[in-house]
């Protein structure tokens, strides 16, 4: 068995884990990131594309914000559609200047990978059977397998940034862990298309047929969602059926300007609200979706 020494082991190589590793490095704290998937798989995942003000500032603090600031689009407001009307909410005005930024999570992850590479950060991919140990002892450790060889990393702290289904939260004893969850009786059918967005700012639409969202990734890449029953399957929805239903849920003036096209990604996301406590057990800390999920 190969043994490694570090200050922090981070389980999960998504945005949360990579950003934490980068922030720790800038404070002189060493870390090892363990990710069970390949880098190509992580960078191929389609995820959210709107970044909150606080996260944008963290990216800058981590020294990873240059491309984000150059290519991302700042939005100072959004629209709410209801009863055929479209009302704009001035986000900057009502928050003292805070805004959101449209910049895909895939690009965030790519920027974080490049930053860790530039600083010779240790990110281990295809780490299988990851398991934290000795969480309440002074020197916890994590074991995993890579290419059939057993590995061990001893550390001061372990961070579980391995998502809702990860091993970290499950390592907290059941008599300590409390979970609060609400599963909603519907999902969001999402389509990604290489078409100009119908609006420069997001549109949240309330309609008797169900919710709809008009979002974007760039000026030539759009992301749209409609609320569907959990019993629906992706194959139940052709592109034509999706566009037709989306138009029904939008005000006429918006629907008239909607440019449709072939989907390049289509999926149904079930929605849940979830919070786990405590977020710390011994020397294990939970971060990101391992600790809490807010739909969508």
Q: Which positions does each model-derived feature cover?
A:
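Glycine-rich FAD pyrophosphate-binding loop
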Residues: 25-46
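Active-site-adjacent segment of FAD-dependent monooxygenases/related oxidoreductases
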Residues: 44-48, 52-117
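Conserved mid-domain beta->alpha element of the FAD-binding
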Residues: 11-26, 30, 112, 159, ...
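Extreme N-terminal starter segment of soluble prokaryotic enzymes
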Residues: 4-8
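Conserved FAD-binding catalytic core of PHBH/FMO-like flavoproteins
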Residues: 114, 121-271, 275-280
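Short phosphate-binding/catalytic loops that engage adenosine nucleotides
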Residues: 29, 64, 121
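Glycine-rich, N-terminal phosphate-binding loop of Rossmann-like dinucleotide-binding domains
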Residues: 41, 162-163, 294-295
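Conserved Walker B
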Residues: 37, 164, 290-291
């Amino acid at each position: 068995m190969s043994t490694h020494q570090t200050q922090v082991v981070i389980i999960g190589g998504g945005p949360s884990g990579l950003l934490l590793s980068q922030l720790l490095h800038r404070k002189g704290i060493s870390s090892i990131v363990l990710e069970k998937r390949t880098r190509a798989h992580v960078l191929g995942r389609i995820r959210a594309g709107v970044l909150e003000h606080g996260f944008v500032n963290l990216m800058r603090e981590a020294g990873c914000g240059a491309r984000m600031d150059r290519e991302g689009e700042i939005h100072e407001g959004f629209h709410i559609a209801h009863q055929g009307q479209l009302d704009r909410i001035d986000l900057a005005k009502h928050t003292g200047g805070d805004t959101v930024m449209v910049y895909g999570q895939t690009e965030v992850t790519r920027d974080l990978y490049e930053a860790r590479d530039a600083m010779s950060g240790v990110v281990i991919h295809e780490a299988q059977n990851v398991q934290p140990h000795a969480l309440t002892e002074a020197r916890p450790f994590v074991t995993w397998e890579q290419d059939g060889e057993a590995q061990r990393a001893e550390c001061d702290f372990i961070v579980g940034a391995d998502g809702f289904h990860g091993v970290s939260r499950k390592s907290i004893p059941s008599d300590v862990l409390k979970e609060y969850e609400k599963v909603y009786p519907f999902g969001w059918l999402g389509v990604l298309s290489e078409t100009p967005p119908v609006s420069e700012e997001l549109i949240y639409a309330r309609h008797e047929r169900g919710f709809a969202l008009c979002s974007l990734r760039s000026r030539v890449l759009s992301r749209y969602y409609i609320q569907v029953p959990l019993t629906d399957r992706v194959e139940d929805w052709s592109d034509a059926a999706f566009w037709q239903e989306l138009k029904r849920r939008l005000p006429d003036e918006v629907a008239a300007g909607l440019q449709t096209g072939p989907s390049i990604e289509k999926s149904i996301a079930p929605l849940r609200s979830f919070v786990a406590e405590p977020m710390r057990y011994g020397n294990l800390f939970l971060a990101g979706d391992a600790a809490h999920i807010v739909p969508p």
